[in-house]
Amino acid sequence: MLESTRDHGTQPLDGLLTRWDITNHQLVETSVEQLNHKQVQRARKGRQLTLHLMQKVARTVNDAVLEKIPKDRQPDFKPYTHKHLFNYARDHDPAWPDPNEALMSP
């Protein structure tokens, strides 16, 4: 695989974490699956990840986002999947509207 095909540029994950005001450190601290800072940074910057790691990042993002949402609004949360967070994932839709936009703090 060529080096240029492994770098996909800044990912939708980066914008999502910015909108939710979640830092790399908060994501690592939230992770119960031993996600590390290097993996999070690679995910945000677009370095190609394995499917397993993309799914691990997606689960951790969901956990971190749930911590940001008030308990009474948590049932309205729609979990993110890897295809929402990475533009090189199969079935990624760049026009996908975030169903959790209304849950974000002003």
Regions found by a protein language model. Give the residues of each.
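Recognition helix of helix-turn-helix/homeodomain-like DNA-binding domains
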Residues: 32-49
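Short, charged recognition helix plus adjacent turn
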Residues: 1-3, 7, 21, 66-106
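Residue-level signal for the short linker/turn that defines the boundary of a DNA-recognition helix
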Residues: 11, 22, 35, 49-52
